Amino acid sequence: MGEQRLLGEVIRLNGQEAVIQVYENTTGLRPGDPISGTGAALSVALGPGLLGNIFDGLLRPLTGQGRYVSPGVDRPDTHTLYPFTPLVKRGDRLSAGKAFAVVQRSDARAQRCLVPPGCEGKVVSIEPAGEYGDDDPVCVLSCDDGGSREISMSHPWPVREPRPVAARMPVEGPLFTGQRILDSMFPLACGGRAAMPGGFGTGKTVLQETLAKWCDADVIVYVGCGERGNEMAGVLHEFPSLADPRTGRPLMERTVIIANTSNMPVAAREASIYTAVTVGEYFRDQGMRVALMADSTSRWAEALREVSGRLGELPGEGGYPAYLSSRQADFYERAAHVRTLGGELASLSIIGAVSPPSADFSEPVTNHTKRYVRCFWALDAVRAQARFYPAIHPLQSYSEDIEVLSQFWSQHGNPQWAVQRRRFLGLIEEQARLERMARIVGKDALPPRQQHVLLCAELINESFLRQSAFSEADRFC
Protein backbone atom coordinates (compact mmCIF):
# COMPACT_ATOMS: atom_id res chain seq x y z
CA MET A 1 0.00 0.00 0.00
CA GLY A 2 1.17 3.50 -0.80
CA GLU A 3 4.46 4.63 -2.24
CA GLN A 4 6.39 2.74 0.45
CA ARG A 5 4.52 -0.49 -0.42
CA LEU A 6 3.54 -1.23 3.17
CA LEU A 7 2.57 -4.81 3.87
CA GLY A 8 -1.03 -5.51 4.88
CA GLU A 9 -3.61 -8.29 4.92
CA VAL A 10 -7.32 -8.24 4.09
CA ILE A 11 -9.20 -9.36 7.20
CA ARG A 12 -12.77 -8.45 6.28
CA LEU A 13 -14.79 -7.94 3.09
CA ASN A 14 -18.07 -6.00 3.13
CA GLY A 15 -19.47 -5.64 -0.37
CA GLN A 16 -17.04 -3.41 -2.26
CA GLU A 17 -15.24 -2.42 0.95
CA ALA A 18 -12.20 -4.24 2.31
CA VAL A 19 -10.72 -3.87 5.79
CA ILE A 20 -6.93 -4.21 5.62
CA GLN A 21 -4.74 -4.93 8.62
CA VAL A 22 -1.46 -3.09 8.04
CA TYR A 23 1.66 -4.62 9.57
CA GLU A 24 3.62 -1.37 9.64
CA ASN A 25 3.25 2.25 10.71
CA THR A 26 0.69 3.91 8.44
CA THR A 27 2.04 7.45 8.87
CA GLY A 28 2.01 9.10 5.45
CA LEU A 29 -0.79 7.03 3.91
CA ARG A 30 -3.52 9.17 2.35
CA PRO A 31 -6.68 8.69 0.27
CA GLY A 32 -5.88 7.85 -3.32
CA ASP A 33 -2.66 5.96 -2.62
CA PRO A 34 -2.29 2.85 -4.81
CA ILE A 35 -2.90 -0.64 -3.43
CA SER A 36 -1.69 -3.80 -5.17
CA GLY A 37 -2.57 -7.37 -4.22
CA THR A 38 -0.08 -10.21 -3.84
CA GLY A 39 -2.64 -12.86 -4.76
CA ALA A 40 -1.88 -14.92 -1.65
CA ALA A 41 -2.39 -14.93 2.10
CA LEU A 42 0.33 -13.60 4.40
CA SER A 43 3.34 -15.77 3.56
CA VAL A 44 7.01 -16.01 4.49
CA ALA A 45 9.96 -17.32 2.51
CA LEU A 46 11.45 -20.50 3.99
CA GLY A 47 15.00 -21.30 2.96
CA PRO A 48 18.65 -21.73 3.99
CA GLY A 49 19.04 -18.16 5.24
CA LEU A 50 16.98 -18.63 8.41
CA LEU A 51 19.35 -20.40 10.83
CA GLY A 52 21.58 -18.11 12.84
CA ASN A 53 19.71 -14.94 11.94
CA ILE A 54 17.39 -12.48 13.68
CA PHE A 55 14.06 -11.38 12.20
CA ASP A 56 11.02 -9.33 13.09
CA GLY A 57 7.50 -10.78 13.32
CA LEU A 58 7.08 -10.84 9.53
CA LEU A 59 10.43 -12.58 8.98
CA ARG A 60 12.16 -9.43 7.79
CA PRO A 61 15.86 -9.38 8.71
CA LEU A 62 16.88 -7.12 11.58
CA THR A 63 20.61 -7.36 10.84
CA GLY A 64 21.91 -4.58 8.63
CA GLN A 65 18.67 -2.60 8.87
CA GLY A 66 19.81 0.14 11.23
CA ARG A 67 17.81 1.06 14.32
CA TYR A 68 14.44 0.35 12.69
CA VAL A 69 13.32 -1.89 9.84
CA SER A 70 12.80 0.02 6.61
CA PRO A 71 9.10 0.12 5.64
CA GLY A 72 8.01 -2.11 2.80
CA VAL A 73 10.71 -4.75 3.29
CA ASP A 74 8.73 -7.98 3.46
CA ARG A 75 11.31 -10.77 3.17
CA PRO A 76 15.00 -11.54 3.81
CA ASP A 77 17.70 -10.27 1.50
CA THR A 78 17.97 -12.66 -1.45
CA HIS A 79 21.37 -11.49 -2.69
CA THR A 80 23.29 -13.82 -0.38
CA LEU A 81 24.83 -16.80 -2.15
CA TYR A 82 24.68 -20.26 -0.56
CA PRO A 83 26.78 -23.37 -1.38
CA PHE A 84 24.45 -25.70 -3.26
CA THR A 85 25.09 -29.45 -3.65
CA PRO A 86 22.50 -31.45 -5.65
CA LEU A 87 21.30 -34.83 -4.34
CA VAL A 88 19.38 -35.92 -7.46
CA LYS A 89 20.02 -36.15 -11.18
CA ARG A 90 18.02 -35.71 -14.34
CA GLY A 91 15.24 -38.28 -14.68
CA ASP A 92 14.81 -38.88 -10.94
CA ARG A 93 11.29 -38.65 -9.60
CA LEU A 94 10.60 -36.28 -6.72
CA SER A 95 7.52 -35.92 -4.55
CA ALA A 96 6.51 -33.25 -2.05
CA GLY A 97 8.81 -33.05 0.96
CA LYS A 98 11.72 -34.89 -0.67
CA ALA A 99 15.20 -33.36 -0.50
CA PHE A 100 16.77 -32.49 -3.85
CA ALA A 101 19.88 -30.67 -2.56
CA VAL A 102 21.82 -29.80 0.56
CA VAL A 103 23.22 -26.43 1.65
CA GLN A 104 26.21 -26.41 4.02
CA ARG A 105 26.82 -22.89 5.29
CA SER A 106 30.02 -22.22 7.21
CA ASP A 107 28.07 -20.56 10.04
CA ALA A 108 25.17 -23.03 10.41
CA ARG A 109 24.37 -26.73 10.31
CA ALA A 110 23.64 -28.47 7.00
CA GLN A 111 20.15 -27.87 5.64
CA ARG A 112 18.25 -29.71 2.96
CA CYS A 113 16.32 -28.08 0.14
CA LEU A 114 12.85 -29.61 -0.05
CA VAL A 115 10.32 -29.96 -2.83
CA PRO A 116 7.42 -27.69 -1.76
CA PRO A 117 4.15 -29.38 -0.70
CA GLY A 118 1.77 -29.90 -3.60
CA CYS A 119 4.54 -30.37 -6.16
CA GLU A 120 5.86 -33.61 -7.68
CA GLY A 121 7.27 -34.88 -10.94
CA LYS A 122 10.46 -35.87 -12.77
CA VAL A 123 13.65 -33.84 -12.73
CA VAL A 124 14.15 -32.17 -16.12
CA SER A 125 17.27 -30.26 -15.12
CA ILE A 126 19.22 -29.37 -12.00
CA GLU A 127 22.08 -26.93 -11.55
CA PRO A 128 25.57 -28.27 -10.78
CA ALA A 129 27.21 -27.73 -7.41
CA GLY A 130 28.06 -24.10 -6.81
CA GLU A 131 26.86 -20.94 -5.13
CA TYR A 132 23.38 -19.58 -5.87
CA GLY A 133 20.89 -17.16 -4.36
CA ASP A 134 18.07 -18.72 -2.37
CA ASP A 135 15.48 -17.56 -4.92
CA ASP A 136 17.46 -18.59 -8.03
CA PRO A 137 15.81 -21.47 -9.97
CA VAL A 138 18.07 -24.49 -9.39
CA CYS A 139 15.79 -27.36 -10.41
CA VAL A 140 13.04 -27.86 -13.00
CA LEU A 141 10.38 -30.54 -12.55
CA SER A 142 8.11 -31.98 -15.21
CA CYS A 143 4.81 -32.24 -13.33
CA ASP A 144 2.25 -34.99 -13.79
CA ASP A 145 -0.28 -32.55 -15.28
CA GLY A 146 2.02 -31.91 -18.23
CA GLY A 147 3.41 -28.59 -17.05
CA SER A 148 6.79 -27.75 -15.60
CA ARG A 149 7.79 -25.98 -12.42
CA GLU A 150 10.97 -24.22 -11.41
CA ILE A 151 12.14 -24.83 -7.84
CA SER A 152 14.56 -22.69 -5.85
CA MET A 153 16.27 -23.28 -2.53
CA SER A 154 13.53 -21.35 -0.74
CA HIS A 155 9.76 -21.32 -1.17
CA PRO A 156 6.90 -19.25 0.27
CA TRP A 157 4.33 -20.66 2.68
CA PRO A 158 1.22 -19.03 4.23
CA VAL A 159 1.82 -18.65 7.96
CA ARG A 160 -1.70 -19.55 9.09
CA GLU A 161 -1.78 -22.85 7.19
CA PRO A 162 -0.13 -25.88 8.87
CA ARG A 163 2.42 -27.63 6.67
CA PRO A 164 1.28 -31.14 5.66
CA VAL A 165 2.81 -34.31 7.09
CA ALA A 166 2.51 -37.99 6.18
CA ALA A 167 1.20 -38.97 9.65
CA ARG A 168 1.04 -37.74 13.23
CA MET A 169 2.83 -40.23 15.46
CA PRO A 170 2.53 -40.99 19.19
CA VAL A 171 5.20 -39.36 21.35
CA GLU A 172 8.17 -41.51 22.33
CA GLY A 173 10.86 -39.74 24.35
CA PRO A 174 11.34 -36.56 26.39
CA LEU A 175 12.69 -33.21 25.32
CA PHE A 176 15.59 -32.76 27.74
CA THR A 177 15.68 -29.17 28.95
CA GLY A 178 18.68 -29.28 31.29
CA GLN A 179 16.45 -28.14 34.17
CA ARG A 180 16.25 -30.79 36.89
CA ILE A 181 12.77 -29.93 38.13
CA LEU A 182 11.37 -30.21 34.60
CA ASP A 183 13.22 -33.29 33.36
CA SER A 184 12.65 -35.29 36.55
CA MET A 185 9.24 -34.12 37.79
CA PHE A 186 7.28 -32.57 34.91
CA PRO A 187 8.89 -33.73 31.64
CA LEU A 188 7.79 -32.60 28.21
CA ALA A 189 7.66 -35.16 25.40
CA CYS A 190 9.21 -34.38 22.02
CA GLY A 191 6.35 -33.00 19.97
CA GLY A 192 4.52 -31.91 23.12
CA ARG A 193 2.99 -28.65 24.28
CA ALA A 194 3.80 -26.84 27.51
CA ALA A 195 2.57 -23.66 29.18
CA MET A 196 4.57 -21.61 31.64
CA PRO A 197 2.24 -19.17 33.45
CA GLY A 198 3.51 -16.78 36.09
CA GLY A 199 3.09 -13.28 37.44
CA PHE A 200 5.51 -10.39 37.12
CA GLY A 201 9.01 -11.19 38.39
CA THR A 202 8.61 -14.96 38.61
CA GLY A 203 11.33 -15.67 36.03
CA LYS A 204 9.37 -16.58 32.88
CA THR A 205 11.70 -14.84 30.45
CA VAL A 206 14.89 -16.12 32.11
CA LEU A 207 13.52 -19.67 32.13
CA GLN A 208 12.46 -19.41 28.47
CA GLU A 209 15.91 -18.15 27.52
CA THR A 210 17.52 -20.93 29.58
CA LEU A 211 15.46 -23.57 27.77
CA ALA A 212 16.36 -22.02 24.43
CA LYS A 213 20.05 -22.18 25.32
CA TRP A 214 20.35 -25.67 26.77
CA CYS A 215 17.52 -27.97 25.61
CA ASP A 216 18.58 -30.82 23.33
CA ALA A 217 16.49 -29.91 20.27
CA ASP A 218 18.24 -29.73 16.90
CA VAL A 219 16.80 -26.28 16.13
CA ILE A 220 15.48 -23.57 18.45
CA VAL A 221 12.97 -20.95 17.32
CA TYR A 222 12.71 -18.18 19.92
CA VAL A 223 9.96 -15.59 19.45
CA GLY A 224 9.72 -12.55 21.70
CA CYS A 225 6.10 -11.55 21.16
CA GLY A 226 5.32 -8.14 22.64
CA GLU A 227 8.16 -8.32 25.16
CA ARG A 228 10.01 -5.28 26.48
CA GLY A 229 12.77 -4.02 24.24
CA ASN A 230 15.48 -4.24 26.91
CA GLU A 231 14.73 -7.96 27.44
CA MET A 232 14.98 -8.69 23.72
CA ALA A 233 18.15 -6.60 23.54
CA GLY A 234 19.65 -8.86 26.21
CA VAL A 235 18.76 -11.94 24.15
CA LEU A 236 20.23 -10.46 20.97
CA HIS A 237 23.40 -9.48 22.81
CA GLU A 238 23.93 -12.74 24.72
CA PHE A 239 22.98 -15.53 22.31
CA PRO A 240 25.68 -14.90 19.66
CA SER A 241 28.40 -15.29 22.32
CA LEU A 242 27.19 -18.64 23.73
CA ALA A 243 28.38 -22.12 22.79
CA ASP A 244 26.22 -25.22 22.45
CA PRO A 245 27.15 -27.47 25.44
CA ARG A 246 26.80 -30.62 23.31
CA THR A 247 28.78 -29.67 20.23
CA GLY A 248 30.91 -26.74 21.37
CA ARG A 249 29.79 -24.83 18.27
CA PRO A 250 28.19 -21.35 18.52
CA LEU A 251 24.63 -21.60 19.81
CA MET A 252 23.30 -19.32 17.05
CA GLU A 253 24.10 -22.00 14.46
CA ARG A 254 20.96 -23.84 15.54
CA THR A 255 18.81 -20.83 16.50
CA VAL A 256 16.31 -18.56 14.78
CA ILE A 257 15.30 -15.48 16.78
CA ILE A 258 12.11 -13.58 15.98
CA ALA A 259 12.03 -10.28 17.87
CA ASN A 260 8.69 -8.49 17.99
CA THR A 261 8.84 -6.01 20.84
CA SER A 262 5.97 -4.13 22.44
CA ASN A 263 6.68 -0.91 20.51
CA MET A 264 6.23 -2.66 17.15
CA PRO A 265 2.80 -2.57 15.44
CA VAL A 266 0.12 -4.62 17.19
CA ALA A 267 -0.90 -6.35 13.96
CA ALA A 268 2.64 -7.65 13.42
CA ARG A 269 2.68 -8.95 17.00
CA GLU A 270 -0.41 -11.00 16.23
CA ALA A 271 1.26 -12.45 13.12
CA SER A 272 4.63 -13.19 14.76
CA ILE A 273 3.38 -16.31 16.57
CA TYR A 274 2.21 -17.85 13.28
CA THR A 275 5.47 -16.86 11.59
CA ALA A 276 7.48 -18.62 14.30
CA VAL A 277 5.48 -21.86 14.19
CA THR A 278 5.72 -21.92 10.37
CA VAL A 279 9.52 -21.63 10.61
CA GLY A 280 9.49 -24.43 13.17
CA GLU A 281 7.43 -26.67 10.87
CA TYR A 282 9.87 -26.01 8.02
CA PHE A 283 12.81 -27.37 10.01
CA ARG A 284 10.64 -30.21 11.33
CA ASP A 285 9.99 -31.21 7.71
CA GLN A 286 13.77 -31.62 7.31
CA GLY A 287 13.70 -34.41 9.89
CA MET A 288 14.84 -32.31 12.85
CA ARG A 289 13.62 -32.01 16.42
CA VAL A 290 12.50 -28.41 16.84
CA ALA A 291 11.62 -26.48 20.00
CA LEU A 292 9.62 -23.26 19.77
CA MET A 293 9.78 -20.82 22.70
CA ALA A 294 6.97 -18.22 22.65
CA ASP A 295 7.34 -15.36 25.14
CA SER A 296 4.63 -14.41 25.73
CA THR A 297 1.32 -15.72 24.41
CA SER A 298 -0.53 -13.26 26.67
CA ARG A 299 0.87 -10.35 24.62
CA TRP A 300 -0.32 -12.16 21.50
CA ALA A 301 -3.81 -12.50 23.02
CA GLU A 302 -3.77 -8.80 23.89
CA ALA A 303 -2.97 -8.02 20.26
CA LEU A 304 -5.97 -10.12 19.21
CA ARG A 305 -8.11 -8.18 21.69
CA GLU A 306 -6.93 -4.83 20.38
CA VAL A 307 -7.52 -5.73 16.73
CA SER A 308 -10.93 -7.20 17.60
CA GLY A 309 -11.89 -4.00 19.42
CA ARG A 310 -10.95 -1.87 16.43
CA LEU A 311 -13.14 -4.06 14.23
CA GLY A 312 -16.08 -3.52 16.58
CA GLU A 313 -16.51 -7.21 17.38
CA LEU A 314 -18.46 -8.29 20.44
CA PRO A 315 -16.01 -8.99 23.28
CA GLY A 316 -15.92 -12.21 25.25
CA GLU A 317 -14.59 -12.88 28.73
CA GLY A 318 -11.99 -10.34 29.85
CA GLY A 319 -12.57 -8.28 26.70
CA TYR A 320 -10.84 -10.91 24.55
CA PRO A 321 -12.50 -11.92 21.27
CA ALA A 322 -14.87 -14.87 21.36
CA TYR A 323 -12.52 -16.80 19.03
CA LEU A 324 -9.51 -16.58 21.39
CA SER A 325 -9.82 -20.25 22.33
CA SER A 326 -9.89 -21.45 18.71
CA ARG A 327 -6.87 -19.28 17.82
CA GLN A 328 -4.92 -20.78 20.71
CA ALA A 329 -5.95 -24.26 19.57
CA ASP A 330 -4.75 -23.47 16.02
CA PHE A 331 -1.36 -22.52 17.44
CA TYR A 332 -0.74 -25.28 19.99
CA GLU A 333 -2.11 -28.10 17.82
CA ARG A 334 0.66 -27.49 15.30
CA ALA A 335 3.07 -29.10 17.78
CA ALA A 336 3.42 -32.83 17.08
CA HIS A 337 5.67 -35.83 16.67
CA VAL A 338 5.24 -36.68 12.99
CA ARG A 339 6.38 -38.71 10.04
CA THR A 340 7.31 -36.14 7.44
CA LEU A 341 6.44 -36.26 3.75
CA GLY A 342 10.05 -37.36 3.26
CA GLY A 343 9.45 -40.40 5.50
CA GLU A 344 11.49 -39.29 8.54
CA LEU A 345 10.45 -39.03 12.19
CA ALA A 346 10.62 -35.46 13.47
CA SER A 347 8.96 -33.27 16.04
CA LEU A 348 7.95 -29.70 16.86
CA SER A 349 7.57 -28.91 20.57
CA ILE A 350 5.95 -25.66 21.73
CA ILE A 351 6.63 -23.97 25.07
CA GLY A 352 4.51 -20.87 25.62
CA ALA A 353 4.90 -18.39 28.46
CA VAL A 354 1.70 -16.86 29.84
CA SER A 355 1.60 -13.58 31.79
CA PRO A 356 -1.70 -13.54 33.72
CA PRO A 357 -2.51 -10.18 35.35
CA SER A 358 -1.90 -10.30 39.12
CA ALA A 359 -0.81 -13.96 38.73
CA ASP A 360 -4.48 -14.94 38.38
CA PHE A 361 -4.46 -18.38 36.76
CA SER A 362 -8.25 -18.26 36.32
CA GLU A 363 -8.07 -15.48 33.70
CA PRO A 364 -9.14 -16.41 30.12
CA VAL A 365 -5.72 -16.83 28.44
CA THR A 366 -4.38 -19.20 31.10
CA ASN A 367 -7.70 -21.03 31.37
CA HIS A 368 -7.94 -21.69 27.63
CA THR A 369 -4.24 -22.57 27.38
CA LYS A 370 -4.66 -25.39 29.92
CA ARG A 371 -7.08 -27.09 27.52
CA TYR A 372 -4.47 -27.45 24.78
CA VAL A 373 -1.21 -28.23 26.61
CA ARG A 374 0.02 -31.42 28.23
CA CYS A 375 2.55 -29.80 30.57
CA PHE A 376 1.67 -26.99 32.96
CA TRP A 377 4.66 -25.38 34.68
CA ALA A 378 3.17 -22.96 37.23
CA LEU A 379 5.61 -20.26 38.36
CA ASP A 380 5.03 -19.21 41.95
CA ALA A 381 5.57 -15.64 43.20
CA VAL A 382 6.33 -16.82 46.77
CA ARG A 383 9.17 -19.09 45.59
CA ALA A 384 10.47 -16.31 43.34
CA GLN A 385 10.46 -13.81 46.23
CA ALA A 386 12.48 -16.35 48.23
CA ARG A 387 15.00 -16.38 45.32
CA PHE A 388 14.14 -20.01 44.62
CA TYR A 389 14.64 -20.50 40.87
CA PRO A 390 13.28 -21.99 38.71
CA ALA A 391 10.22 -20.82 40.66
CA ILE A 392 8.06 -23.73 39.44
CA HIS A 393 5.60 -24.78 42.12
CA PRO A 394 5.79 -28.60 42.34
CA LEU A 395 2.26 -28.94 43.74
CA GLN A 396 0.54 -26.73 41.14
CA SER A 397 2.36 -28.08 38.08
CA TYR A 398 1.67 -31.28 36.17
CA SER A 399 2.63 -33.33 33.12
CA GLU A 400 0.26 -35.62 31.22
CA ASP A 401 3.11 -37.47 29.50
CA ILE A 402 4.24 -39.38 32.60
CA GLU A 403 2.90 -42.78 31.52
CA VAL A 404 4.52 -42.66 28.08
CA LEU A 405 7.83 -41.36 29.44
CA SER A 406 7.85 -44.04 32.16
CA GLN A 407 8.18 -46.57 29.35
CA PHE A 408 11.05 -44.52 27.90
CA TRP A 409 12.94 -44.54 31.22
CA SER A 410 12.26 -48.25 31.72
CA GLN A 411 13.94 -48.90 28.37
CA HIS A 412 16.86 -46.59 29.24
CA GLY A 413 17.97 -47.96 32.59
CA ASN A 414 15.65 -46.47 35.23
CA PRO A 415 12.46 -48.56 35.58
CA GLN A 416 11.83 -46.97 39.02
CA TRP A 417 11.61 -43.41 37.66
CA ALA A 418 7.83 -43.06 38.07
CA VAL A 419 7.99 -44.48 41.63
CA GLN A 420 10.82 -42.12 42.59
CA ARG A 421 8.91 -39.17 41.14
CA ARG A 422 5.81 -40.02 43.18
CA ARG A 423 7.92 -40.28 46.35
CA PHE A 424 9.50 -36.88 45.66
CA LEU A 425 6.11 -35.24 45.15
CA GLY A 426 4.73 -37.02 48.22
CA LEU A 427 7.55 -35.66 50.37
CA ILE A 428 7.04 -32.10 49.09
CA GLU A 429 3.28 -32.34 49.66
CA GLU A 430 3.82 -33.59 53.22
CA GLN A 431 6.35 -30.80 53.78
CA ALA A 432 3.73 -28.18 52.88
CA ARG A 433 1.33 -29.69 55.41
CA LEU A 434 3.92 -30.03 58.18
CA GLU A 435 5.26 -26.50 57.71
CA ARG A 436 1.85 -25.11 58.58
CA MET A 437 1.95 -27.09 61.82
CA ALA A 438 5.57 -26.10 62.49
CA ARG A 439 4.72 -22.41 62.25
CA ILE A 440 2.26 -22.92 65.11
CA VAL A 441 4.09 -25.29 67.47
CA GLY A 442 7.68 -25.02 66.22
CA LYS A 443 9.80 -27.63 64.44
CA ASP A 444 11.30 -28.96 67.68
CA ALA A 445 7.84 -29.94 68.95
CA LEU A 446 7.19 -32.23 65.99
CA PRO A 447 7.77 -36.00 66.25
CA PRO A 448 11.17 -37.22 64.98
CA ARG A 449 9.67 -38.79 61.83
CA GLN A 450 8.03 -35.51 60.82
CA GLN A 451 11.26 -33.61 61.48
CA HIS A 452 13.01 -36.13 59.25
CA VAL A 453 10.41 -35.56 56.50
CA LEU A 454 11.00 -31.80 56.67
CA LEU A 455 14.77 -32.31 56.46
CA CYS A 456 14.49 -34.65 53.44
CA ALA A 457 12.11 -32.28 51.65
CA GLU A 458 14.44 -29.35 52.32
CA LEU A 459 17.37 -31.32 50.88
CA ILE A 460 15.34 -32.14 47.76
CA ASN A 461 14.36 -28.50 47.29
CA GLU A 462 17.74 -26.94 47.97
CA SER A 463 20.11 -29.45 46.39
CA PHE A 464 18.04 -30.84 43.52
CA LEU A 465 15.14 -28.60 42.50
CA ARG A 466 16.95 -25.30 42.94
CA GLN A 467 19.13 -24.38 39.97
CA SER A 468 20.95 -21.20 38.99
CA ALA A 469 20.62 -20.05 35.39
CA PHE A 470 23.72 -17.87 35.81
CA SER A 471 26.11 -20.45 37.25
CA GLU A 472 28.37 -22.16 34.71
CA ALA A 473 28.40 -25.30 36.86
CA ASP A 474 24.67 -25.47 37.55
CA ARG A 475 22.79 -23.85 34.66
CA PHE A 476 22.65 -27.06 32.63
CA CYS A 477 22.48 -30.40 34.41
Label every PLM stretch briefly.
Residues 1, 13-14, 21-26, 39-40, ...:
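A structural micro-motif recognizing beta-strand termini
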Residues 184-185, 191-477:
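P-loop NTPase catalytic core
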